[in-house]
């Protein structure tokens, strides 16, 4: 498993304006992660993304 910022098609992390932890948690769990939250960036950060399920890349820092 890996942790990181899941990215959209434009290689930018998913924004979570308003620090919406529920949005990020759902987004991450939909990607089969253990959980997720909104960090100060503000972007969604996921914990426990399975390597074999995650098709798109993740970033370890930064929005784009």
UniProtKB/Swiss-Prot annotation:
<feature type="disulfide bond">
    <location>
        <begin position="12"/>
        <end position="64"/>
    </location>
</feature>
<dbReference type="InterPro" id="IPR036574">
    <property type="entry name" value="Scorpion_toxin-like_sf"/>
</dbReference>
<keyword id="KW-0964">Secreted</keyword>
<feature type="disulfide bond">
    <location>
        <begin position="28"/>
        <end position="46"/>
    </location>
</feature>
<keyword id="KW-0872">Ion channel impairing toxin</keyword>
<keyword id="KW-0800">Toxin</keyword>
<feature type="disulfide bond">
    <location>
        <begin position="24"/>
        <end position="44"/>
    </location>
</feature>
<comment type="similarity">
    <text>Belongs to the long (4 C-C) scorpion toxin superfamily. Sodium channel inhibitor family. Alpha subfamily.</text>
</comment>
<dbReference type="Pfam" id="PF00537">
    <property type="entry name" value="Toxin_3"/>
</dbReference>
<dbReference type="GO" id="GO:0006952">
    <property type="term" value="P:defense response"/>
</dbReference>
<comment type="function">
    <text>Alpha toxins bind voltage-independently at site-3 of sodium channels (Nav) and inhibit the inactivation of the activated channels, thereby blocking neuronal transmission. By extending the depolarized period it indirectly affects beta-cell voltage-dependent potassium channels, thus increasing potassium permeability.</text>
</comment>
<feature type="disulfide bond">
    <location>
        <begin position="16"/>
        <end position="38"/>
    </location>
</feature>
<keyword id="KW-1015">Disulfide bond</keyword>
<keyword id="KW-0528">Neurotoxin</keyword>
<keyword id="KW-0738">Voltage-gated sodium channel impairing toxin</keyword>
<feature type="domain" description="LCN-type CS-alpha/beta">
    <location>
        <begin position="2"/>
        <end position="64"/>
    </location>
</feature>
<dbReference type="InterPro" id="IPR003614">
    <property type="entry name" value="Scorpion_toxin-like"/>
</dbReference>
<dbReference type="GO" id="GO:0090729">
    <property type="term" value="F:toxin activity"/>
</dbReference>
<protein>
    <recommendedName>
        <fullName>Alpha-toxin Ts5</fullName>
    </recommendedName>
</protein>
<dbReference type="GO" id="GO:0019871">
    <property type="term" value="F:sodium channel inhibitor activity"/>
</dbReference>
<dbReference type="InterPro" id="IPR002061">
    <property type="entry name" value="Scorpion_toxinL/defensin"/>
</dbReference>
<dbReference type="GO" id="GO:0005576">
    <property type="term" value="C:extracellular region"/>
</dbReference>
<dbReference type="InterPro" id="IPR044062">
    <property type="entry name" value="LCN-type_CS_alpha_beta_dom"/>
</dbReference>
<dbReference type="InterPro" id="IPR018218">
    <property type="entry name" value="Scorpion_toxinL"/>
</dbReference>
């Amino acid at each position: 498993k890996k942790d990181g910022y899941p990215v959209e098609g434009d290689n930018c992390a998913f924004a979570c304006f308003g620090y919406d932890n529920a949005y990020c948690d759902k987004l991450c769990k939909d990607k089969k992660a253990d959980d997720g939250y909104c960090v100060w960036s503000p972007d969604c950060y996921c914990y426990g993304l399975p390597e074999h399920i995650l098709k798109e890349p993740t970033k370890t820092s930064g929005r784009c």
